[in-house]
């Protein structure tokens, strides 16, 4: 085994050390006054209670699947061990990110009393813990599994060895599914419940401490957008690397004649390793003391561009060193993925930002009522699929022409190589959002709230861009895993003239819609319970509306937690059982059709829902700035309705589809021996 392979866990450890330093920096910040401490403790306590209960529930699933893997697969015990290892590290990353975010929010509010610079520093440092934990633990676990098993089982076929290690990605996918679905149900149940009764019925502002669901809403921001987003991208990161390694083992001899197969296998690991170093360096470019949101955007872009440029340079050196004359083709495939990821983020921003035409059109439609708002927003969401589809298609075409199926997979690795910093930027948003809520609830000065509002506005944009990036990376990762599955079962093409294959295609195209239905209905049911509870408290607690009595915040947290844990099980079972049943009943070709159908329909549906939801959200915010009558106007009420409809679209169903298409692909790959 080439000594260069040992670089990967070392770079991963550097990322983890940097995450530890960032955590220490957050802890060293002042906690604020007693009221800030009290609110922070309530949010932190609610988030950690939910996360602990969720992980206990997932542990049962993980143990059950591990036993099944050990019993039914060749090399099942090794696959089960990798599965558990991947699940544990994914859960650890989520725990680290959640722990940090829920102690950073109050500290960000307190830092905002000293100016935007200190507040920005604290919130971004918190995001950095999540970003670096995900890439550090993901690459460390994957490379360690490869090194240990490779050194022990020296006589094992390389493709077989890597198929065992694919269990690591399956473990990551399992955690991701429940974290995304459960977290999405929790956050939107609380959010919708708080908005419907608080804003629409009671007429009180957002983050008002009189609202019984306000703490649950803030807890949900962390549960969904920190732990959920982190697990989603951890899964894509790990899945893209293992898919590329599998394709290298199976196609290297034909695609790169004369190059040692191990060199081709190592390329994704080494690119991921240098991507971590580039991300760490990129964080030092994220600095600003200016109060304009454009300056904060510029600071983030400087960091992202620095990381991308460094990764491009390093990838050129790595591919040239490992692949010789073929290095340039693989290098340009990597760059195609990097550029595609960046462009999809920009397209998402265009469709969801309130200073761009699509969202302004949605905001304008609010003047004629809720119905026209919903119609226009949904239409714009569907329209927004055009350019991401074109961009992904061009990236796939370029990568395939340059390096075959391996090129497509390495494009996914390229897209995710700078995940360390891009996820840090995404994870900053919920902290800034919480800080604004805490500022409101702790009655801070207007200047402090303006600072947190500025940080939050930037966070909304970065979150929308992050969702677009997550969808694009999920599509490429799922396609790479699908290609690995096809090789594992000996499929050379998907013959749609074969009835079984066409049946699989139809079932696959249907599954994202059924899955979305289940998650959206779950949000509706859970939100209904929260609404009933909030109404009860406003009615029964005397003096609550006047601010003379405190609401029972814990009740709404308990309802949201119970609903999320109960409702996340059926979608999770569907995602695992569907590909296994189709493979066993209709055969490997039909399962190939299912995977192809789910990737195509899932990609389009996820973009539609995420961008429609983001557009409705920011159309409402545009009206709240004083446009079309401002807060309390009929246009604002229509905007709130659109935002409420969009909440489960953009924060529950849309993001969860990413995991569905990846999880079904990895399930098919891991269980491939059963379908041959």
Curated annotation (Swiss-Prot):
Residues annotated as binding substrate: 188, 650
Catalytic activity: Na(+)(in) + diphosphate + H2O = Na(+)(out) + 2 phosphate + H(+)
Positions bound to Mg(2+) 1: 191, 195
Membrane topology, as annotated: Multi-pass membrane protein
Membrane-crossing segments per the record: 3-23, 58-78, 83-103, 129-149, 158-178, 241-261, 265-285, 298-318, 324-344, 390-410, 411-431, 469-489, 501-521, 572-592, 593-613, 656-676
pH dependence: Optimum pH is 7.5.
GO biological process: sodium ion transport
Name of the top EC class for this enzyme: translocase
Binding site for Mg(2+) 2: 218, 221, 433
Modes of activity regulation: Requires K(+) for maximal activity. Inhibited by the Na(+) ionophore monensin, activated by the K(+) ionophore valinomycin and unaffected by the protonophore CCCP.
Top-level division of the source organism's lineage: Archaea
Cofactor(s) the protein needs: Mg(2+)
Binding-site list for Ca(2+): 617, 643, 647
Residues with site note (Important for ion transport): 180, 225, 232, 651, 662
Keywords: Calcium, Cell membrane, Ion transport, Magnesium, Membrane, Metal-binding, Potassium, Sodium, Sodium transport, Translocase, Transmembrane, Transmembrane helix, Transport
Site features described as Important for potassium dependence, chain residue numbers: 463
An annotated Gene Ontology molecular function: magnesium ion binding
Protein task: Sodium pump that utilizes the energy of pyrophosphate hydrolysis as the driving force for Na(+) movement across the membrane.
PANTHER family (alphabetical): K(+)-INSENSITIVE PYROPHOSPHATE-ENERGIZED PROTON PUMP
HAMAP family on file: PPase_energized_pump
Protein name as it appears in the record: K(+)-stimulated pyrophosphate-energized sodium pump
Native species: Methanosarcina mazei (strain ATCC BAA-159 / DSM 3647 / Goe1 / Go1 / JCM 11833 / OCM 88) (Methanosarcina frisia)
Gene that this sequence comes from: hppA1
């Amino acid at each position: 085994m080439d000594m260069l392979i040992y670089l990967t866990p070392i770079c991963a450890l550097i990322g983890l050390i940097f995450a530890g330093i960032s955590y220490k920096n957050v802890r060293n910040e002042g906690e604020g006054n007693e009221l800030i401490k009290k609110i922070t403790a309530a949010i932190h306590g609610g988030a950690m209670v939910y996360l602990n209960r969720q992980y206990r529930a997932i542990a049962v699933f993980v143990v059950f699947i591990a036993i099944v893997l050990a019993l039914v697969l060749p090399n099942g015990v090794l696959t089960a061990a990798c599965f558990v290892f991947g699940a544990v590290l994914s859960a650890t990353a989520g725990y680290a990110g959640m722990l940090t975010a829920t102690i950073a929010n109050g500290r960000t509010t307190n830092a905002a009393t000293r100016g935007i610079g200190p507040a920005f520093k604290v919130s971004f440092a918190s995001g950095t813990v999540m970003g670096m934990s995900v890439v550090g633990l993901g690459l460390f676990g994957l490379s360690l599994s490869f090194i240990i098993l490779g050194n022990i089982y020296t006589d094992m076929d390389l493709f077989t060895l890597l198929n065992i290690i694919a269990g690591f990605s399956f473990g990551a996918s399992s955690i991701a599914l429940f974290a995304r679905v459960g977290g999405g149900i929790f956050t939107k149940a609380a959010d919708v419940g708080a908005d419907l009764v608080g804003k629409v019925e009671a007429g009180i502002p957002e983050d008002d401490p009189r609202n019984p669901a306000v703490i649950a809403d803030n807890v949900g921001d962390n549960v969904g957008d920190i732990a959920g987003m982190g697990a989603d991208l951890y899964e894509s990161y790990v899945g893209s690397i293992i898919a590329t390694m599998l394709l290298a083992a199976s196609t290297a001899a034909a695609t790169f004649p004369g190059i040692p197969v191990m060199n081709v296998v190592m390329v994704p690991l080494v690119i991921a390793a240098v991507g971590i170093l580039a991300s760490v360096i990129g964080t030092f470019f994220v600095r600003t003391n200016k109060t304009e949101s454009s300056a904060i955007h510029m600071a983030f872009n400087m960091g992202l561009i620095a990381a991308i440029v460094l990764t491009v340079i390093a990838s050129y050196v790595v591919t040239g060193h490992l692949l010789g004359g073929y290095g340039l083709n693989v290098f340009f495939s990597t760059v195609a993925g990097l550029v595609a990821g960046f462009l999809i983020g920009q397209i998402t921003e265009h469709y969801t930002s309130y200073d761009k035409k699509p969202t302004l059109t949605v905001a304008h439609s609010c003047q004629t009522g809720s119905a026209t708002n919903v119609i226009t927003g949904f239409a714009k969401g569907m329209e927004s699929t055009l350019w991401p589809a074109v961009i992904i298609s061009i990236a796939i075409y370029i990568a395939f022409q340059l390096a075959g199926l391996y090129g497509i997979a390495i494009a996914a690795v390229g897209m995710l190589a700078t995940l360390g910093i891009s996820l840090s930027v995404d994870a900053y948003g919920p902290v800034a959002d919480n800080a604004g809520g805490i500022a409101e609830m702790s009655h801070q000065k207007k200047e402090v709230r303006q600072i947190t509002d500025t940080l939050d506005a930037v966070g909304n944009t970065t979150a929308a861009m992050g969702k677009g990036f997550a969808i694009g990376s999920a599509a490429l990762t799922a396609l790479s895993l699908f290609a690995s599955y096809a090789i594992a079962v000996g499929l050379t093409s998907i013959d749609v003239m074969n009835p079984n294959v066409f049946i699989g295609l139809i079932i696959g195209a249907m599954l994202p819609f059924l899955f979305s239905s289940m998650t959206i209905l779950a949000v509706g049911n859970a939100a209904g319970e929260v609404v009933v509870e909030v109404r009860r408290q406003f009615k029964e607690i005397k003096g609550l509306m006047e601010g003379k009595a405190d609401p029972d915040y814990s009740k709404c947290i308990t309802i949201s937690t119970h609903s999320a844990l109960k409702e996340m099980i059926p979608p999770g079972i569907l995602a695992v059982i569907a590909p296994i049943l189709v493979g066993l009943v209709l055969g490997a070709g039909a399962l190939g059709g299912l995977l192809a159908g789910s990737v195509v329909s899932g990609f389009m549906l996820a973009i539609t829902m995420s961008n429609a939801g983001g557009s409705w959200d920011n159309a409402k915010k545009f009206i709240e700035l004083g446009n079309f009558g401002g807060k309390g106007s009929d246009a604002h009420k229509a905007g709130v309705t659109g935002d409420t409809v969009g909440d489960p679209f953009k924060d529950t169903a849309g993001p969860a589809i990413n995991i569905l298409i990846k999880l079904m692909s990895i399930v098919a790959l891991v269980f491939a021996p059963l379908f041959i």
